[in-house]
Design a protein with these regions (language model features):
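Histidine-rich, glycine-flanked metal-binding segment
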Residues: 2-10, 15-58
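Short beta-strand-to-turn element immediately C-terminal to the catalytic PLP-Schiff-base lysine
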Residues: 17, 30, 74-76, 150
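Histidine/acidic residue-rich metal-binding segments in metalloenzymes
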Residues: 42, 150-158
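Short amphipathic alpha-helices and their capping/turn segments at secondary-structure boundaries
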Residues: 46-55, 113-124
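Divalent metal-dependent hydrolysis catalytic cores, especially in the metallo-beta-lactamase
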Residues: 67-69, 84-113, 125-139
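Glycine-rich phosphate-binding "P-loop"
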Residues: 71, 139-151
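Distinct, well-ordered alpha-helical segments
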Residues: 111-114, 144, 154-157
Length: 158
């Protein structure tokens, strides 16, 4: 448990969104870049410097379907580095966790995307991989290329 005396930075936003509520007058205690204390009733002593912030602080966003970002599409560049570039592009808008998404494509592209995601997961906000297709309806495939739509088979499951 972190004590108030251990906190090295105090932040008082004008509004803070947390746990489904908008808080006014909340104070955050930050240590080593991580929020340690969140309270609405702490009296921060004059010995502590408080940074007043005129804006909203909220938890980072989690995006469960991210095909690309920063000029990179996962289907075109199924590598760990591309996944990190995609995450970096989304992070500047408040997204702290993503599921990079690969859509219906060749077995080779899907396999490389899976391998890249397995290397990247747990780093830079990569939570896993969203595989969209290829086992979908040809008639309702939308933007997915028909030549890559296929039924599920035992080889794919292995």
């Amino acid at each position: 448990v972190t004590e108030a005396a251990d906190i090295i930075q105090w932040i008082r936003p004008s509004r803070l969104f947390n746990e489904g509520r908008l808080h006014i007058g909340a104070v955050l205690g930050v240590l080593n870049g991580r929020v340690q204390i969140f309270t609405e009733d702490i009296q921060v002593k004059e010995a502590h410097q408080v940074m007043d912030f005129d804006g909203i602080i909220s938890p980072g966003f989690v995006d469960l379907q991210v095909n690309g970002g920063g000029g990179v599409l996962l289907n075109e560049t199924p590598t760990k580095e591309a996944i990190w570039d995609i995450a970096k592009a989304h992070r500047k808008y408040g997204t702290t966790g993503i599921l990079p998404t690969v859509i219906t494509d060749s077995v080779s592209v899907l396999s490389r995307a899976v391998d890249a995601a397995m290397e990247a997961v747990g780093q830079n906000g990569i939570l896993g991989l969203h595989i969209e297709g290829p086992h979908i309806s040809v008639e309702r495939r939308g933007t997915h290329k028909a030549e890559f739509v296929r039924p599920l088979d035992e080889d794919t499951i292995r």
